[in-house]
Amino acid sequence: MKNIILASASERRQELLKRILEDFQIIVSDFDESSIPFKDNIPSYVMNLAEGKARSVSKKIMDQDSNLVIGCDTLVAFNNKVLGKPKDKKDAFEMLQALSGNEHEVYSGLAILDVKSNKIITDFVCTKVKFSKLTSLQIEKYINTGDPMDKAGAYGIQGKAGVFVENINGCYYNVVGLPLNKLNSMLMEMGVNL
């Protein structure tokens, strides 16, 4: 059995991976996301970011050849504009105000790299999420919890912002940060049967 390494500091991703894998390591990627410019193709962009994270971690473990490294990146898109993590409370407010009453997309790029063979597979998942109309007070109260500050699009569906979601079309776990169904099929493609 290959050793599985998650190239992420995200507690949400770690919790989700524990649902399908009993044993894996965490090695945080030091990949510079700004090294990949966004060029209007969101699926390609998130897959490139995920691959960058996986390759960054693989360089740290070159002496261990029975490893598979999982890289993942999630972002929110609204009107073909990428919404990353908010810079500050004002930025979070503007993001949530834009999403209010509207549908947006959540994209996750996945990359799985076999360190020994250097074989890599990448894929992505897109989930459509529609928010109810939010009041300024709702947005401010949510921002004051601190919850949105480390999340793409300034919200976490698994937390208090779950009440903002009117409907979802696609993988719920993708919106949380790790699309388990897609990850499972990619792991199977790399010879890992869960």
From Swiss-Prot:
One Gene Ontology CC term in the entry: cytoplasm
An example molecular function term from Gene Ontology annotations: UTP diphosphatase activity
Location in the cell: Cytoplasm
Site (Important for substrate specificity): 12, 74, 158
Main localization category: cytoplasm
Single biological process term from Gene Ontology: nucleotide metabolic process
Protein name listed in UniProt: dTTP/UTP pyrophosphatase
Family per similarity comment: Belongs to the Maf family. YhdE subfamily.
